[in-house]
Amino acid sequence: PVPLTFRYSRSPLNETVLSLLEEGLGSLYIVFFTQREALDYANQLKSTALITKEQRARIAEALRGFRFSTSFGVSLRSLLLHGVGIHHAGMLPKYRRLVERLAQAGLLPVICGTDTLGVGINVPIHTVVFSGLAKFDGHRQRIVKVREFQQIAGRAGRAGFDTEGLVIVQAPLDEIEALRATRKGQKQKKKKKEPGVVSWNEKTFEKLTTAESETLVPRMHMTASMLLNLIERPGALFENTKHLITNSFVTRAQQRALALEAFELFRGLEKSDVVTRQAEPFEDNRWVHISGDLPHELALNQPLAPFALAYLTILDTDSPDYPLQVLSVVESIVENPYPLLYAQQKKLRNERAQILRDDGVSYQEMMAELDEITWPQPLAEELSAALNSYREEHPWARQWELSPKSVVREMVENGMTFGDVIATYGISRAEGTVLRYITDCYNTLRHLIPAEKITDEIRDILDWLRSLIEQVDNSLLAEWEALQAGRVPTEEERDATTPPPALTDNRYLFERLIRTVMFRHVSLLALDDTKTLAQLDERIAEEFPDWYEETEPYWAEYDDILTDQDARSARFITIDSSDNGST
């Protein structure tokens, strides 16, 4: 690494950036601690002439043939053509790699990004500019730790190109404004500090640049996935597990706890017939193997995957809701995509709030009810009860919790594409987060479900999910499959795209979409909303009935139309596909 020079800046961020570029101290990486701030400032820079016409032409040539397939992609393309990059964990991998390639080619004088820089992205940077030193860590706002600061600052300076790297830390806005007012001879009013807001000053900056990094604390858990990998290794499972635990950096007491955890996990896997002991060892001295009737390349990558595998065995494959139940089980053990879940919750609360306001409910009562609304959690009660029973025989499961949700299930139920999800919930900054979640669900489905539990509908869902992922960004699948094959994926594999399949290619999903649209009709009829119903029909059919006239005899005899869960049953709809295979 090259030596670093540190500066504390009391100039507005725009002045700092332009001054650095005029001094020839680019390329710059401006660190923000939220994705919104990074994108907002990047858009501000579009009004600043950062590049020449010739540089813009070079960028346009580099972008030729690249597929900006999402709403965020359109915004990104515009930024790149102004010489501004954006980089954060919520982006699709293909967009992050594009920004990195352009930066490596020297085409981007400025990149606005988050502290993902600290994990070592492949971008050559001369100057790192901290827009601030306070971040929200998921629980509270705090000053960045010394180790975090040094990890990010250490990316400044290009080995082999620079003799030094430059790190700038911006003063808080109120300090900058106070200095400006003093220079103008004005009296600056002291602003009241907002609750929970953390500030910093030059002493904070000096401490971060000179203090020793915090001590790293080792953390380790034994998981079913780790045990399966140890079972696949040559040699005795006991010795392999002992070697892994005793060579870790945790304390002796923690090592003993890990050994007990590993024993409980193995006993649970054996009892569930996931693994089997041999009477005689294999040639490579393995005494344990994965049971033959489980999926090829079985992967229990989520901590509660063994529980999910056990729960799947009790589901009825003949149930019309079986595919959706499987999705709910899988989604309950996959890591939460919080930006999407919070957006789902917000949408449900807004819809309910409008109904309560129309009904004249008091503000206090309305807020109390809205506080109880969360994102959709199908099978939450059933899964929670089953997990409590499972824990009685598998104590290791007590340290993990389920997180029921409905993302892939909602997409299947409503026939939604990736773009539909992003647009419906307004989360274009979280496209990468959502795609990673969908990919995790796909991989979990593919590697978890026993062969006898894979129905035609499940195969259709798997095919659809793979197609969806490949259309949006193939790199996640390419990297996963290359990792399993023990190699590094090529750029061609990462960047490969596939054309979208015809809607009718996947019969299960096509029929679900038909049922969803038809139940939307029923719901509107139940509300006697013939106007919206007519507008819906205009979008999907050339000819449609006069719903007011058609429903008049019904309303003359009945008071309402049921729209409960039972009303959604597939038994109430018949789909005729006999006309030369068309539906």
Residue ranges of each PLM-predicted region?
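SF2 helicase motor core recognition
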Residues: 96-97, 101, 107, 111-129, ...
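Conserved nucleotide-binding/hydrolysis micro-motifs of P-loop NTPases
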Residues: 1-3, 9, 34-38, 91-92, ...
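Short glycine-/polar-rich loops that comprise or flank the Walker A/P-loop
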Residues: 1, 25-26, 81-82, 108, ...
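Conserved segment of the helicase C-terminal RecA-like domain
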Residues: 123, 127-183, 187
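Non-catalytic terminal extensions of ATP-dependent helicases
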Residues: 85, 104-105, 189-582
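Conserved interdomain linker/interface between the two RecA-like ATPase lobes of SF2 helicase motors
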Residues: 1-49, 78-89
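Conserved helicase ATPase core of P-loop NTP-dependent helicases/translocases
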Residues: 69-114
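Alpha-helical "lid/cap" subdomains adjacent to substrate-binding clefts that gate access
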Residues: 45-77
